[in-house]
Amino acid sequence: MFNKKSGPSGRTNKSYKNTSEPLAVQPIVGDGNCLFRALSFAITGDEEQHAVVRSLICDFLESTGHQKAGELRQNKVWGTTTEILAAAEMFQLNVCVWASFGRVHTWHIHKPKGDTATQPVYLENKIGNHFNVVTRV
């Protein structure tokens, strides 16, 4: 279930601090669409399908009554944790995000409701404002 203002509600996601960093990363174009490009690459092998991934996520968010889904349809509007959780739910994926801020290194694992994921997707959140795809953990 998604909260109309902020996104998912009633979810449990896990974080693991100071764990091993990714062994290999696929760089993603940094043009304001990087979350959607990264998800596109992780799912289809082609980051150029980012507009389709963005549209599907927006459709999903609109179906839940999310208030900012229309704004998110614009090219180059950054994706956030809300969109990551929507992707986890609609694609039935565990979206694992590596974040490194100074000396704190954390894997954040975003799961679909009911923990029904069929496969994981690994992303890297670079300094809080860019996403790449982790290709080896």
Predicted regions and their residues:
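Active-site nucleophile-adjacent alpha helix/oxyanion-hole segment immediately C-terminal to the catalytic cysteine
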Residues: 2-67, 91
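Cysteine-nucleophile protease catalytic domains, especially the papain-like/related folds used
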Residues: 54-86
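Intrinsically disordered, low-complexity segments enriched in small/polar residues
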Residues: 5-8, 30, 63, 77, ...
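Deubiquitinase catalytic domains
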Residues: 73, 80-137
